[in-house]
Swiss-Prot record:
Protein name, as recorded: Fasciclin-1
Sequence ranges assigned to domain FAS1 in this UniProt record: 22-144, 166-310, 317-463, 467-616
Annotated glycan sites: N47, N368, N416, N441, N497
SMART domains according to UniProt: FAS1
PANTHER family: MUCIN-5AC-RELATED (PTHR10900:SF120), PERIOSTIN-RELATED (PTHR10900)
Length: 652
């Protein structure tokens, strides 16, 4: 009887081993998972789980281990003792690690599934089911990293919530980053309950480095602390929807603060607060903070350590730019600051002298364009370009939108006679703001970074350094769309990509063509019809000077003063004009008409565009353009009429 029992027990153990072998064999046989398998083999608890229980294992690839910076990988943190398919994964699952710290599951709108900060590779999941023990393996692209206690602190809890982490941060393995200043402000404001709250939240904690300004810590009140918490939402950086504002705990009737994440092309992650509705203590505007230590899992959510507090606006525009000197490697505007200083730093002094100022600051990536390198060597030209990014006004998105209500907003810069042209499309999170300056169209990728004396808007191109041809500019600029359409159907535009010629193009803006509709309604209609493309092309040819150089407005004013007028070569003939400067604006005098220059000197890689308020159009052009036949057809009709008259006379 005893022998039979022993035999039965041996058979059961063998069956368990066989069941476990199914998943273990798949792990062992996959060479891309060998590093995790070797760790699994040496862990008795993990082996026991595979032998005896249902489970889900999240298995990092070998490539993920190569990117993993920590010395220790925690196998049990990758295992949960219940089987979950991808579809059945709940918001949290308990890991098998000591203290059972949770793993957070995020399913985003793209269909991706994340475990903490690791993405599940959907096609590689494996399921086995033997003797009722269902086991599932999901392959992930990152090693899961739990919050662990430093050696010598055995009394510190293994699975702390955000408050316990904040109180004992020095005892955890978080790269020796201090948070004492913020911790003391949380205690003084009696806001521990915010970090102690049960549930699943995102906590943002400024590090001590962010409180170098002596008065900054005193500005951290209860509302600011609320603004560092996103309640009821766990956001790991890889799973974050970029520029997707989430209501912070400081979102109420009289104060509304949102928080969102965004990522630079170099992979650096930032978080920003946007105070939409402020009060006497909390200004409206955006505050950026770099994430210095991301994705620290705690029992009630996730903690991100950030380089400065959110919501607090306590630096001038100059001080904000100077802060990138200290953050030489990864600052969002590091390159912009370097270019200013390489130019002698006088631009920074000019900015500092302004009581109200707005900066259009190109991102680090914007300076990587090859055509900028040549300009960087020319200090005078570079000074003009930098000044083109400075506005003597406090200009946020709301103010730009007000200026943009009925037309494209025109705003002067500190560069003499140079304007920027803003265009706002969409509402709310769908708002797109573009700005044109010196022939370059840029998109605002981060608006309303607030400072005590103004705003900084981060843009994706350097203004004043053209990167497109005359045709490319016409095609992309909303103010020139009518001229572009007319040139397209008449094939006039075909020549404008030629980089062997230099063009000076006087382009009527859309409102100019709309005025001709009032002055000559019949002609206006026909100018935009393909059947009359010959006439459209002839009129456009008058607006285009073709030479071996382009002519700026200053050139044309100078030539006009010297000779009384300027004669420019065009495709068929020449264009005779006089250009004058009146009160800082330019006026073209053509055939006794005065035409305002709305946007001078829009530079392109193969020429220059001057946007004018009205086309170079005469009444006699309208008579010619009013015909409904091409010249060849007109000649045929005249000949036919002459023949008919001759025949009639002969018959008589």
């Amino acid at each position: 009887m005893l022998n039979a029992a022993a035999l039965l027990l041996a058979l059961l153990c063998a069956a368990n081993a066989a069941a476990a072998a199914d998943l273990a064999d798949k792990l062992r046989d996959d060479s891309e998972l060998s590093q995790f398998y070797s760790l699994l083999e040496s862990n008795q608890i993990a082996n026991s789980t595979l032998s005896l229980r249902s489970c889900t294992i999240f298995v990092p690839t070998n490539e993920a281990f190569q990117r993993y910076k920590s010395k220790t990988a925690h196998v049990l943190y990758h295992i949960t003792t219940e089987a979950y398919t991808q579809k059945r994964l709940p918001n949290t699952v308990s890991s098998d690690m000591a203290g059972n710290p949770p793993l957070y599951i995020t399913k985003n709108s793209n269909g991706d599934i994340f475990v903490n900060n690791a993405r599940i590779i959907p096609s590689l999941s494996v399921e086995t089911n033997s003797d009722g023990k269902r086991q599932i393996m999901h392959i992930i692209d990152e090693v899961l990293e739990p919050l662990t206690v430093k050696a010598g602190h055995s009394d510190t809890p293994n699975n702390p919530n955000a408050l316990k982490f904040l109180k004992n941060a020095e005892e955890f393995n978080v790269d020796n980053i201090g948070v004492r200043t913020y911790r003391s402000q949380v205690t003084m404001a009696k806001k521990e309950s915010v970090y102690d709250a049960a549930g699943q939240h995102t906590f943002l904690v400024p590090v001590d480095e962010g409180f170098k300004l002596s008065a900054r810590s005193s500005l951290v009140d209860g509302k600011v602390i609320d603004g560092h918490v996103i309640p009821n939402t766990v956001i790991f950086t890889a799973a974050a929807q970029h520029d997707d504002p989430k209501a912070s705990a400081a979102f109420e009737d009289l104060l509304k603060v949102t928080v969102s994440f965004f990522k630079q092309k170099n992979g650096k992650m930032y978080v920003k607060s946007n105070t939409i509705v402020g009060d006497a203590k909390h200004r409206v505007g955006v505050v950026l903070a770099e994430i210095v230590k991301a994705n620290i899992p705690v029992s009630n959510g996730v903690v991100h350590l950030i380089h400065r507090p959110l919501m607090i606006i306590d630096t001038t525009v100059t001080q904000f730019l100077q802060s990138f000197k200290e953050n030489a490697e990864n600052g969002a505007l590091r390159k912009f600051y370097e270019v200013i200083m390489d130019n002698g730093g006088a631009v920074l002094d000019d900015i500092n002298s302004l009581t109200e100022v707005t900066i259009l600051a190109p991102s680090n990536e914007a300076w990587n364009s090859s055509n900028i390198n040549n300009v960087l060597r020319d200090r005078n030209k570079m000074r003009q370009i930098l000044n083109m990014h400075i506005i003597k006004d406090r200009l946020n998105v709301d103010k730009i939108r007000q200026k943009n209500a009925n037309l494209i907003a025109q705003v002067p810069t500190v560069n003499n006679n140079t304007f920027l042209y803003f265009n706002v499309r969409g509402e709310g999170s769908d708002t797109v703001i573009t700005v044109e300056g010196g022939g370059v169209n840029a998109t605002v990728i981060q608006a309303d970074v607030a400072q005590t004396n103004g705003y900084v808007h981060i843009i994706d191109h350097v203004l004043g350094v053209p990167y497109t041809t005359v045709l490319g500019k016409l095609e992309s600029d909303p103010m020139m769309s009518d001229t572009y359409k007319m040139g397209k159907f008449s094939h006039f535009n075909d020549q404008l990509n030629n980089t062997q010629r230099r063009f000076t193009y006087f382009v009527p803006r859309d409102k100019g063509w709309q005025k001709t509709e009032l002055d000559y309604p019949s002609a206006h209609k026909k100018l935009f019809m393909a059947d009359f493309s010959y006439h459209s092309k002839s009129i456009l040819e008058r607006h285009l000077a073709i030479s071996d150089k382009e002519y700026t407005m200053k050139d044309l004013v100078k030539f006009s003063q010297e000779s009384g007028s300027v004669i420019l070569p065009t495709f068929r003939d020449s264009l005779s004009i006089r250009v004058e400067e009146e009160a800082g604006r330019y006026v073209i005098i053509w055939n006794y008409k005065k035409i305002n220059v709305y946007r001078p000197d829009v530079e392109c890689t193969n020429g220059i565009i001057h946007v004018i308020d009205y086309p170079l159009l005469e009444e006699k052009d309208v008579v010619v353009a009013g015909g409904s036949y091409l010249p060849e057809s007109s000649i045929c009709i005249i000949l036919a009429n002459l023949i008919m008259i001759t025949v009639a006379k002969f018959l008589n």
